[in-house]
Amino acid sequence: MPTPLLPLLLRLLLSCLLLPAARLARQYLLPLLRRLARRLGSQDMREALLGCLLFILSQRHSPDAGEASRVDRLERRERLGPQK
């Protein structure tokens, strides 16, 4: 593809796909976010929700977390040597 066509193609994609999607998202998400902001008007409610969210996020483990912990255990065993 010739280089001068690339910016034109990107601009076309941006105007045809991304801008309408952003408009739709704004149209549907803004009222929801405003309603949520009204419900979370009190500082206590915001702190409680943030605490719950942080707890949930702290409980999530990546798929590699189990593998990494197994490797860590094996490395620890090698460093400590045979157990009596």
Curated annotation (Swiss-Prot):
One Pfam family of this chain: MINION
All ranges on the Cytoplasmic side of the membrane: 1-4
Sequence motif AxLyCxL, location on chain: 48-57
Residue intervals annotated with topology Extracellular: 26-84
Entry GO CC: endoplasmic reticulum membrane; Golgi membrane; plasma membrane
Transmembrane segments: 5-25
Signal peptide annotation: none
InterPro entries: Myomixer
Pathological association: Carey-Fineman-Ziter syndrome 2: An autosomal recessive disorder characterized by weakness of the facial musculature, hypomimic facies, increased overbite, micrognathia, and facial dysmorphism. Some patients manifest failure to thrive, axial hypotonia, and progressive scoliosis.
Subunit structure as annotated in this protein's UniProt entry: Interacts with MYMK.
Domain comment as written in the entry: The AxLyCxL motif is required for myoblast fusion.
Protein name (database record): Protein myomixer
Organism: Homo sapiens (Human)
Designated gene of the protein: MYMX
